């Protein structure tokens, strides 16, 4: 699919702008109707003056989206350029964000979570087959296509995606609680970082709180570097061993031993009947409501901040001794009382 930038003096000659859908770091997304038809798009409007120094990021997003055609990935339909703006006409998805939809459900089971994760795995496996690493998978980037109950889930936001020309990538990026250990260590990394993020998302979908959490970034990073998480009681008491086994394979600290997307798709929790049909909506929705209003989980992240922290603390990147001696772990967001550190 080759999408050339179509030149226009005024985007209103191409689309009727209806309303604002949202905004990002340097763009706004508008609901727009194509002139001469009833076709609606999500129009990403990027001022060129905001692009100075960021041109490569946007060009990369366009390059990635041009290569993609998958039923569970939001499509780029057209690209327009005016003297002042760049416009990306994206497939319109109207079903809302993942967590919001879970909260609105009448019931929610492991089988529902398994079905969701399976769809995302299929989309990410497709990206990986093209040599594309998403690099910023998180619940906010998982949207429902329609408001209907049987709607499919869609992967969105390819601003940080990268086409993996060689074997590994080197630029650290992502969102704090979802980044893989090798990314924090600033080692070359690849597709396995997406699998790790899917492990974090799968964990949250089954209990409503994140596996790695602390108000202090250095301690959060230390937990991630050690892959230090637990299946806390009572939140995990009714979750199957198969689900826990699946998550362990995705949250494997060593990227060489971590499941690939294909291996994850073949796990019985995804491909078989291992996912339980017990309703877990009450517990999960309560924890989602409690934990994901936190702006902490929406901050942008660059791993250089982590390196500054550990240098000040005199730690190695593995973050062992200084964190044992100098930091106290805050209460886990899913738990009512402070826990002892998980050393």
Swiss-Prot record:
In terms of Gene3D superfamilies, this protein maps to: Phosphorylase Kinase, domain 1 (3.30.200.20), Transferase(Phosphotransferase) domain 1 (1.10.510.10)
Give the enzyme's EC designation: 2.7.11.17
Keyword flag ATP-binding: yes
Could you tell me which SUPFAM superfamilies the record lists for this protein? Protein kinase-like (PK-like)
Q: How is its activity regulated?
A: Activated by Ca(2+)/calmodulin. Must be phosphorylated to be maximally active. Activated by CAMKK1.
Q: Which residues carry this modification: Phosphoserine?
A: 338
InterPro entries associated with the record: CaMKI_beta_STKc, Kinase-like_dom_sf, Prot_kinase_dom, Protein_kinase_ATP_BS, Ser/Thr_kinase_AS
PTM characteristics: Isoform 1 and isoform 2 are phosphorylated by CAMKK1.
Whether DNA repair counts among this entry's keywords is no
Q: What tissues harbor this protein?
A: Isoform 1 is expressed in liver, heart, lung, kidney, spleen and testis. Isoform 2 is predominantly expressed in cerebrum and cerebellum.
Q: Name one GO molecular function term.
A: calcium/calmodulin-dependent protein kinase activity
Q: Kind of enzyme, top EC level?
A: transferase
Domain Protein kinase, chain residue ranges per copy: 15-270
Cellular component GO terms held in the UniProt record: cytoplasm; nucleus
Tell me which domain of life the UniProt entry assigns to the organism this sequence originates from: Eukaryota
Chain sites annotated for binding ATP: 21-29, 44
What is the disulfide pattern of this chain?
none
Compartments in which it is found: Cytoplasm; Nucleus
Q: Which UniProt keywords apply?
A: ATP-binding, Calcium, Calmodulin-binding, Cytoplasm, Kinase, Nucleotide-binding, Nucleus, Phosphoprotein, Serine/threonine-protein kinase, Transferase
The segment annotated Disordered runs over 314-343
> Region annotation Calmodulin-binding: residue ranges?
290-311
Instruction: State the family named in the UniProt similarity comment for this chain.
Output: Belongs to the protein kinase superfamily. CAMK Ser/Thr protein kinase family. CaMK subfamily.
User: Per its database record, what is this protein's job?
Assistant: Calcium/calmodulin-dependent protein kinase belonging to a proposed calcium-triggered signaling cascade. In vitro, isoform 1 and isoform 2 phosphorylate CREB1, SYN1/synapsin I. Phosphorylates and activates CAMK1.
Q: What is this protein called?
A: Calcium/calmodulin-dependent protein kinase type 1B
Gene symbol here is Pnck
